Amino acid sequence: DASKSRGLGDVYKRQSHDQMPALERWVLHRLAEIDSRIREMTEGYDFHGIFTELHTLCNSDLSAFYFEIRKDRLYCDAADSIERRACRTVMNEVYERLTAWLAPILAFTAEEAWQARVQNIENSVHLRSYDPIPDGWLDPALGERWAGIRQVRQVVTTALEAARNDGAIGASLQAAPVVHVDAAGAELFAGEDAAALFITSDAQITTDAAPADAFRVEGIENAAVAFATADGGKCARCWKIMPEVTSEDGICNRCDDVVNLSLIHI
């Protein structure tokens, strides 16, 4: 196991690719897509192209999308949950590849980031090569599906920002949007937790006709959002608005299960 040679040991249990949620598999697909382009650009000494590719990955795909969505899993799920373990596994894969890809461009920064975990000056990031991409990571159909999900999500997040500007909500977790899509749009979200993807406390995906005053984004014809606020109280642990929370210091069912499980393991 390469991770053991890099000082990671058994810090966490890895989640196998076939048991990961679709969002985690999409991140690995993006790494596979980028890897082939970076190898080609490295051969051609196109380091500006590599920088542009990685800037888009870090800014758009990771920071503004994946990390934003998965913070709740990392902070609030049970430590040994499959979803949280899958997230940590993917974040490790991102780290290992980013440090290698950035090494020729940001030599000192890449080394500092690498040594923060390896803590072995003789094991330099500059002695590494690009890790091979495992079979199965590249999945064009999955990539196309998540491109569609992100387009619908853009309408929802824009609607939430408008509601925030109007003073209807202070944070997205106060919302429970009803998202009107066509049949193809509904299929995109099959099996997914739409509220988690939108960072709201609740959400509905429906193929019903959207009301005339539903929020729309010009150029995106397959989605419209009817704004609604979430019912219930604010969970003191995860901050979601849930119907089972009835007191100021109450917590939701998910958090109650996690806390009780943690107490058992003490």
What are these model-predicted stretches?
Residues K13-E40, F67-A159, A163-A183, T206, ...:
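Acidic, turn-prone loop/beta-hairpin segments
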Residues L62:
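TRNA-recognition modules of translation machinery and tRNA-sensing kinases, especially anticodon-binding
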Residues L197-I199, A203:
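A glycine-rich helix N-cap at a beta->alpha junction
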